[in-house]
Amino acid sequence: NISFRKELIKAWDKDMIYQERTVTMITLLMSYSLCISVILYRKMKVLLIDVYNYNKGGAETVCFNTGKLLEEHGHQVVYFTLKWEENNPSPYSKYFPESKETRKGPLKQVKNMVNYFYHFEAAKKMEQLIKDERPDIAHIHLMWGQITPSIFPVLRKYHIPILFTVHDYRIVCPAYTFRDGSGRICEDCKGKYFYKCFTHTCCKGSKVMSAVMAAEQYFRNAFF
């Protein structure tokens, strides 16, 4: 219940190291459970999806470690990320859609805003990758506000099973953190009142960013 979750968050706040280790352990167990299932089943082609193709943070570490473990057991791993200057070389880079940093042209900012809600190129590139590589399963790590849920209809179209490792609270909290602009523990959105992200200025102290994040959450819940 809500009160229990609040007490749990308070307890974690007393020891951030413990919190980080706990979250890391949960995500690792979820990822490795996929590996174990695949290893015990048959050799498969696994599509790993993340925003970045380099070690930007914990989600990428889990993603790449999962891929390494799968490959060690004879499975083929295909990566799908956005383009970034820091990306590691990849044989699948031709399928990577543009990111907000690599996109060019006079309409860059407009496209960046549109693609925060729905990334048309990501959907197109995902479909081409699936046609060429024919993965057996997709394992998503990060995608919010970057790759976006635009890839979901494509994965469903080709009947690709999806595993989603949740690395943060973005599914239910526009600000990712269950905290408002003042740092107070907050669950006021309750899965549907996302305008409160704007009224509480939850996202990095910015009304504009909070409004965009809330709007994206409404859009995603309405169409996906």
Task: Indicate residue ranges for each PLM-predicted region.
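N-terminal subdomain of nucleotide-sugar transferases
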Residues: L34-E86, K131-E133, T148-I151, Y158-P161
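A conserved catalytic-core segment of Leloir-type glycosyltransferases
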Residues: H73-I137, Y193-H200
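A short, histidine- and acid-enriched strand-loop-helix "catalytic/donor-clamping" loop
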Residues: G145-Q146, V166-Y176, V208
